[in-house]
Amino acid sequence: MYKAKRTAAQKVRRCLGKYELGRAIGQGTFAKVRFAKNMETGDHVAIKILDKAKVQKHRLVEQIRREICTMKLIQHPNVVHLHEVMGSKTRIFIVLEYVMGGELHDIIATSGRLKEDEARKYFQQLINAVDYCHSRGVYHRDLKLENLLLDTAGNIKVSDFGLSAISEQVKADGLLHTTCGTPNYVAPEVIEDKGYDGALADLWSCGVILFVLLAGYLPFEDENIVSLYNKISGAQFTCPSWFSAEAKRLIARILDPNPATRITTSQVLQDQWFKKGYESPVFDDKYYPYFHDVYDAFGDSEEKHVKEAMEEQPTLMNAFELISLNKGLNLDNFFESDKKYKRETRFTSQCPPKEIINRIEEAANLLGFNIQKRNYRMRMENIKEGRKGHLNIATEVFQVAPSLHVVELKKAKGDTLEFQKFYQTLSTQLKDVVWELEDAAEDMS
């Protein structure tokens, strides 16, 4: 018989509480992001994983904790949703909404500028999300195309609040003082580092984004960082000829280098160009977040830590191994033609692999067999000695498809006829587990 286990790849499932972790989809200085699935609901999520030691070494505990608390304050259809926060002894896990449509930046990079109506739709969603955040005292401070994701319906989802600042942390002069953000999108007052209004700085970045959507390129670019900052501080940009007069007027009011005279978000919402086709999102914003899970995640209490586990999955059969199970194509059968009974057999099942292996164990125990089990492999030995010693049977569950498994039973020691009788009794007891047995004719050579 072809030995499936020699070539089949063993799958190992990495579990984090109720989540199954998948491939890495992002990597930063302090965090890795993995695709994951909620095993209870089947929903896909993204889990940001932070190393506690690295965070503590760089004295970023408070900043990361603030980021998490900030995201919990935000419940808006155009902002990436934070589901929950968990912790282990060594890591922090931030469970986020998984946004499947990619980055808005990629659309511009591959297709160039957008039509005005399409750009306006994205800008409307962005402004609505930003206005919502500001109303709750939350400022993004790093708005750029790369942080604007798209869902499957083509709607914006603002991501990455790693540089956000809560209004409670504003200094006595009522201004923020930390310089951050991406150079091409940053407001002049942020560059000057004299303190700035977070809402007005965010709006400047929104103006840069609108320009890029309509033009296909940045309004402020220069290889020399000093020259770039000079262009930003002086608002040295020119709108292309294809911009409508209304769009030019709005962009000029947003990209005003003087924050005291710059248009506000509430004024943008009343702008005639902006209001064209505008539909305010309807959603329930009566949300009162709790923060105890954030402190539990950063704490040292093992009782409140999430369980991490590596779980072996059934071996996955490839196409050649499946073909070898077909008696007509299996060359091993030529060498077994003189044997009355086969020393191995199998059946298929649509039950979960854990249920299959547990049911076999229960039935074998009732038939007087001792069991040794490891994941989806099992060795069964009859307590009573038979005609040729103790009957010993090796069993393994293989995965053929997500909901289809092959269960293989092989006689390792003992009498072949006793093995066949055992299998007939076992398959009868497992009739609700067995989907299809090998053809009865294949039980005889």
From Swiss-Prot:
Q: Which residues form the active site?
A: 142
Question: What task does this protein carry out?
Answer: CIPK serine-threonine protein kinases interact with CBL proteins. Binding of a CBL protein to the regulatory NAF domain of CIPK protein lead to the activation of the kinase in a calcium-dependent manner.
* Name the record gives this protein: CBL-interacting protein kinase 3
**The Protein kinase domain, residue ranges:** 19-274
- What does the comment on domains in this protein's record state? The activation loop within the kinase domain is the target of phosphorylation/activation by upstream protein kinases. The PPI motif mediates the interaction with the ABI (abscisic acid-insensitive) phosphatases.
Entry-linked CDD domains: CIPK_C, STKc_SnRK3
Q: Which GO terms describe its molecular function?
A: ATP binding; protein serine kinase activity; protein serine/threonine kinase activity
- The keyword Zinc-finger belongs to this UniProt entry's keyword annotation: no
The record's Gene3D superfamilies line, in alphabetical order, gives: Kinase associated domain 1, KA1 (3.30.310.80), Phosphorylase Kinase, domain 1 (3.30.200.20), Transferase(Phosphotransferase) domain 1 (1.10.510.10)
Name the lineage. Eukaryota, Viridiplantae, Streptophyta, Embryophyta, Tracheophyta
One of its GO biological process terms is:
signal transduction
Q: Please give the SMART domains that the UniProt record associates with this protein.
A: S_TKc (SM00220)
Co-factor requirement: Mn(2+)
Please name the SUPFAM superfamilies in this protein's record: Protein kinase-like (PK-like)
Query: Which keywords are on file for this protein?
Result: ATP-binding, Kinase, Manganese, Nucleotide-binding, Serine/threonine-protein kinase, Transferase
The broad enzyme category this protein falls into is transferase
Residue positions annotated to bind ATP are: 25-33, 48
Name the reaction it catalyses.
L-seryl-[protein] + ATP = O-phospho-L-seryl-[protein] + ADP + H(+); L-threonyl-[protein] + ATP = O-phospho-L-threonyl-[protein] + ADP + H(+)
- EC code: 2.7.11.1
Renumbered to this chain, region (PPI) spans 342-371
NAF domain span: 309-336
* Region (Activation loop) location: 160-189
Q: Report the sequence similarity comment from the record.
A: Belongs to the protein kinase superfamily. CAMK Ser/Thr protein kinase family. SNF1 subfamily.
According to the record, the signal peptide region is: none
| Top-level division of the source organism's lineage | Eukaryota
